UniProtKB/Swiss-Prot annotation:
This is Pyridoxine 5'-phosphate synthase. 1-deoxy-D-xylulose 5-phosphate binds at residues 9-10, 45, 50, 100. It is found in: Cytoplasm. InterPro entries: Aldolase_TIM, PyrdxlP_synth_PdxJ, Pyridoxine-5'_phos_synth. It is an enzyme of class 2 (transferase). 3-amino-2-oxopropyl phosphate binds at residues 7, 18, 192, 213-214. Homooctamer; tetramer of dimers. Its main location: cytoplasm.
Amino acid sequence: MPTLGVNIDHVATIRQARRTVEPDPIAAAVLAELGGADGITVHLREDRRHIQERDVRLLRQTVRTHLNLEMAATAEMVAIALELKPDYITLVPERREEITTEGGLDVNGQPERLQTVIDTLQQAGIPVSLFIDAEAKQIETAARLGAKFIELHTGRYAEAGSPQAQQRELETLAQGCARAIDLGVRVNAGHGLTYWNVRPVALLPGMEELNIGHTIVSRAVLVGMERAVREMKQAIQGTF
């Protein structure tokens, strides 16, 4: 079964709604790990709408599993990553007007720029993952650029309007996963996964890690972070 990376961005979203000090994402990360999280994921956005640079610095010192930093491929973010050296980086697309990340990174449209960023980070010992749609050309370009991982965007699967549409999207994810593995690229997945739709994605051959945030934080508001994480681990394993 794939491991679970818990995205704690929306703990910071609640905090930033009042520009106060609580809830504390660092405390949430500790509780998530106590609940069985295999990793902690945060997205340091250029507009700092939720996670702040201070959060990432503190998480780097306190996370005991591994820290996955999601970021845009900008000079500012590369400099921060080189200083803090998270366990790995996931490069994601970013638009200020979006509520959350919408769609995968277009690696075909910017190979030279991404090559520079990937080389810079990986030469510093930080493995790079690319958050992309499960499209053959995107996956092949990601492999050619030397990314160690891809993270397949599962939003279309999660938002499918019927069981038939969801099954088609699952098949697309399966094909993408298989193609990446054939090319020697390791595979993670995430976006829109919930307690009720995660199991089929978890069963895809070769899937290594699922990065899940909003549904866990939403449940944690009601039942607590440790229990919410334990129950997601159960959902991944098919025992929820």
